[in-house]
Amino acid sequence: MAGWSCLVTGAGGFLGQRIVHLLAEEKELQEIRALDKAFRPELLEEFSKLQSKTKLTMVEGDILDEQCLKRACQGTSVVIHTASVIDVMNVIHRETIMNVNLKGTQLLLEACAQASVPIFIYTSTIEVAGPNSYRDIIQNAHEEEHLESTWSAPYPYSKKLAEKAVLAANGWALKNGGTLHTCALRPMYIYGEGSIFLYNYIYKALRNNGILTHHSKFSIVNPVYVGNVAWAHILALRALQDPKKAPSVQGQFYYISDDTPHQSYDDLNYNLSKEWGFSLDSRMSLPISLEYWLAFLLEIVSFLLSPIYKYQPPFNRHMVTLSNSIFTFSYKKAQRDLGYKPLFSWEEAKQKTTEWIGSLVKQHKETLKTKTH
């Protein structure tokens, strides 16, 4: 596709900025449009360095602003839609999550149809597939098993419906007479430098004398490095641009994992941070069944108090299930259809993430020094 352009939504985010960096290396790409609600000053500076490789247009706007989406899509060849509200603790209002994740996706699909954008790639999540119960054992699952989340929690529910909307839009007629082709990527839990989940977890441990709290020692999952997820998006757009590969990719979803060892979330956090003296909490944790029912009771308390007081439980049943399930997936279909293989090995991903955690430790020490002087 000569002289093509690409719009990335959520371009200022953890994954979105990696996609922008990889896009800047693509041949014949004339313009990247980076859309987000706001861009941090340091990211603006970082993106400005990419201008020497390709034209980069920053668009600050809301995914629910139809006029903004219309302008952003005009003259664009590909849309990569990563913008999303992620919330597993039910802290954010349900309506906000449903609006951004579902309505925002629907509005963007409509904007693509009006602006005749032929390719749409959606960043979904493993949570659209479950896990539905911590008792279920799902190992090396694949797309043909058609696993589906039954949770009504707003994040997995909104992402599930949005993904369905994206795949159903495959084959839509475009305003110029062309056809819209879509696909969705379902990454595992994404880790790497800049992860807000990892950032919060490490800072909590730093305030706790370097002790990493137990959340999920019973889980077995296959987390994926952020750089490999970004790479999968590039391969998906290349496949949809390739007349030979495109027919087998159109309307499909793909699990995206890599060669990170299958392990618990607790072990992942420990393996990424142990170089800096962090250690796992040696105290006994509650049995999962007890933790699950305790979460249920806290949810009932929260519901009963809701007319007079907003009580936020420290954990919920969805979180307990997510954190304590055996839930792993194969990337063979992505390998077959997209030519996907991880760009970064486990050792490289671990080194990059560990170095970043080291910078957080250093930052924390400097903050403490400032406070004591």
UniProtKB/Swiss-Prot annotation:
Question: Which reactions are catalysed by this chain?
Answer: a 3beta-hydroxy-Delta(5)-steroid + NAD(+) = a 3-oxo-Delta(5)-steroid + NADH + H(+); a 3-oxo-Delta(5)-steroid = a 3-oxo-Delta(4)-steroid
Per the UniProt entry, the Enzyme Commission number(s) are 1.1.1.145, 5.3.3.1
Q: Name one GO molecular function term.
A: oxidoreductase activity, acting on the CH-OH group of donors, NAD or NADP as acceptor
Q: Which GO terms describe its biological process?
A: C21-steroid hormone metabolic process; steroid biosynthetic process
Q: Where in the cell is it found?
A: Endoplasmic reticulum membrane; Mitochondrion membrane
- What function does this protein fulfil? 3-beta-HSD is a bifunctional enzyme, that catalyzes the oxidative conversion of Delta(5)-ene-3-beta-hydroxy steroid, and the oxidative conversion of ketosteroids. The 3-beta-HSD enzymatic system plays a crucial role in the biosynthesis of all classes of hormonal steroids.
Tell me which family the UniProt entry assigns to this protein: Belongs to the 3-beta-HSD family.
| Positions of transmembrane segments | 288-308
Kindly tell me the pathway this chain contributes to: Lipid metabolism; steroid biosynthesis
Active site per UniProt: 155 (proton acceptor)
Entry keyword set: Endoplasmic reticulum, Isomerase, Membrane, Mitochondrion, Multifunctional enzyme, NAD, Oxidoreductase, Steroidogenesis, Transmembrane, Transmembrane helix
What's the name of the protein?
Answer: 3 beta-hydroxysteroid dehydrogenase/Delta 5-->4-isomerase
Q: Which SUPFAM superfamilies match?
A: NAD(P)-binding Rossmann-fold domains
Positions the record marks as coiled coil are none
Membrane topology is:
Single-pass membrane protein
Question: Could you tell me the superkingdom of the organism this chain comes from?
Answer: Eukaryota
Q: Which organism is it from?
A: Canis lupus familiaris (Dog)
Locate the residues binding NAD(+).
159
Cellular component terms per the entry's GO annotation? cytoplasm; endoplasmic reticulum membrane; intracellular membrane-bounded organelle; mitochondrial membrane
